[in-house]
Amino acid sequence: GQKHKKELSCAEKIANYYGVRRISFDVTPLFSYSHNSLMENSDKAVPKTSYAEQIEETKGQSPVSTYVPFRNGIFLSAAAGVALSLDCERVVYGAHADDAAGAAYPDCSPSFFDAMKTAVYEGTGGGITLKAPFIHMNKADIVAEGLRLHVPYELTWSCYEGGDKPCGLCGTCRDREAAFA
């Protein structure tokens, strides 16, 4: 249901790079009720301001306009079910401190992670552990760790627009540029 599919092609490239199987399924119907600025059924424009500016606008009291309600909860629940079915031991997701700041993305907060970690563990009979290794790290620290590990950043995409090149103006472009500086 996103306005662009660029992240999907990048996910495929990254899975191929690491030689891992990528499993995907269409969850568009689940998000068809959300009309935030990221969704194709929305006429709202993606903000061309930094997350800090967006958080300032909301006074840190509500999510930013690119928040998809409970998206990570839905993704993590589905991933836990698939992981258990495939005899995996853990599900890992990339929540980080910057996304949790100022209530921007409530499903990236440490309290959300703790609640989901318990729910996933209990809901799978102790079969799946949820991990969020970046939950207390900012994007600059994550980029530094990725560079140390030789992450193929050229295969990644952060921009909320789906063009050939990042727009350089949306919150994710601005934060990515700052993280690499």
Residue positions per predicted region:
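A short alpha-helix-loop-beta-strand transition element characteristic
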Residues: 150-156
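Local cysteine-cluster metal-coordination motifs and their immediate loop/turn environment
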Residues: 77, 157-178
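Structured loop/turn residues at beta-strand edges in well-structured enzyme cores
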Residues: 86, 154, 168
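Adenosyl-5′-phosphate
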Residues: 181
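ATP-dependent adenylation/nucleotidyltransferase module used to activate substrates
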Residues: 1-150
